């Protein structure tokens, strides 16, 4: 029975910001209230994802949370009200192979999943349940889809993938348009992450092989690649996030210091000094800022699996770990209200 007190508690909980992370050991997803510090871990969903968690995102309205994972159905979505609701029924046509990452359109009316097997991307209408899978693009991405994002206007969808050209972008009107011409200078290796600036005027790709991050002006087509930062990320670029104001870009990567942040004004500024306490002791795999831009979170291998720092244009002192840690290597991280572009 829901009492007046418990109902009020649920409403307060639902209104709080939350931080969510995926990991490679059951329950594969961990969510915590966020108030500038970690709250008590939210109870696991009744039906867990079926394998290692990879990507994670909330709907733009924050009323559902989606998890990409290994093993069919490859994507699991739950109503969200500060706690997990009953898992939404799987789509009639599942993504082909392990789900890697997913994104919702800015309007929240479609969900896109990057996945392991051809066609490497699957998009579904979203109304709180999955609609019929949208027809594949005429020109498929050339390899495993690893990350996905929409422009802020929702007019284009981008897929980071293995195999040249490593990035594929399509006009989006509820169906796929003709693939946009490749950039003149391709990313230098398999792509792992993609993000648009909040203003939508640049697209950033994290990838294997130096320089490990490539950024291009974006006007519906790729512009000339922006000059590399003076100090490159030290290892394979995995995930990318811009601050909500668009004035900094963060790259999670392999090799110490595992996170690199740069001022962004359409070109790279001087790399921000590393945090005093680095995230974990091996690969940074996911990165996100709070919607207000006052904290930055990194999902990483090795305990504590997630590290969060105050952010004021520089790293503050690492925030205390949650009382209940994620149970395995952190794969991705997001905040409720953080827009994955």
Where are these regions (language model features)?
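Enriched but not universal
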Residues: 1-18, 334-341
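Short coil/turn segments that connect the beta-strands within blades of beta-propeller domains
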Residues: 16-17, 61-63, 107-109, 153-155, ...
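Short loop/turn segments immediately following the C-termini of beta-strands
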Residues: 24, 70, 116, 162, ...
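Beta-strand initiation motifs
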Residues: 36-44, 82-90, 128-136, 174-182, ...
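Surface loop/turn motifs at the tips and blade-to-blade linkers of beta-strand repeat domains
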Residues: 46-50, 92-96, 138-142, 183-187, ...
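Blade-level signature of beta-propeller repeat domains, shared across WD40, Kelch, NHL, RCC1
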Residues: 306-308, 325-341
């Amino acid at each position: 029975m829901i009492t007046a007190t418990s109902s009020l508690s649920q409403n307060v909980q639902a209104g709080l910001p939350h931080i969510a992370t995926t990991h490679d050991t059951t329950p594969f997803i961990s969510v915590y209230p966020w108030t500038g510090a970690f709250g008590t871990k939210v109870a696991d969903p009744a039906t867990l994802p079926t394998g290692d968690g990879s990507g994670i995102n909330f709907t733009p309205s924050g009323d559902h949370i989606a998890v990409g994972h290994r093993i069919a159905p490859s994507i699991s979505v739950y109503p969200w009200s500060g706690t997990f609701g009953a898992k939404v029924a799987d789509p009639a046509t599942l993504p082909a192979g392990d789900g890697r990452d997913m994104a919702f359109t800015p309007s929240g009316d479609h969900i896109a999943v990057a996945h392991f097997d051809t066609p490497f991307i699957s998009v579904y209408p979203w109304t709180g349940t999955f609609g019929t899978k949208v027809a594949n693009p005429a020109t498929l991405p050339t390899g495993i889809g690893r990350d996905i994002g929409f422009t802020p206007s929702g007019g284009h969808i981008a897929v980071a993938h293995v195999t040249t050209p490593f990035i594929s972008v399509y006009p989006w009107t509820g169906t796929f348009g003709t693939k946009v011409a490749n950039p003149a200078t391709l990313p230098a290796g398999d792509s792992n992450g993609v993000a648009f600036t909040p203003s939508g005027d640049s697209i950033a790709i994290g990838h294997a092989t130096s320089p490990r991050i490539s950024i291009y002006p974006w006007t519906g087509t790729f512009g000339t690649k922006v000059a590399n930062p003076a100090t490159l990320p030290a290892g394979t670029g995995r995930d990318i996030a811009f601050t909500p104001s668009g004035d900094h870009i963060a790259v999670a990567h392999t090799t110490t210091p595992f996170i690199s942040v740069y001022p962004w004004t359409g070109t790279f500024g001087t790399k921000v000094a590393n945090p005093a306490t680095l995230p974990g002791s091996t690969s940074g795999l996911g990165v996100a800022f709070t919607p207000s831009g006052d904290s930055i979170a990194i999902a990483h291998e090795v305990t504590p699996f997630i590290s969060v720092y105050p952010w004021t244009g520089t790293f503050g002192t690492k925030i205390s770990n949650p009382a209940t840690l994620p149970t395995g290597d952190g794969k991705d991280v997001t905040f409720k209200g953080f827009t994955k572009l």
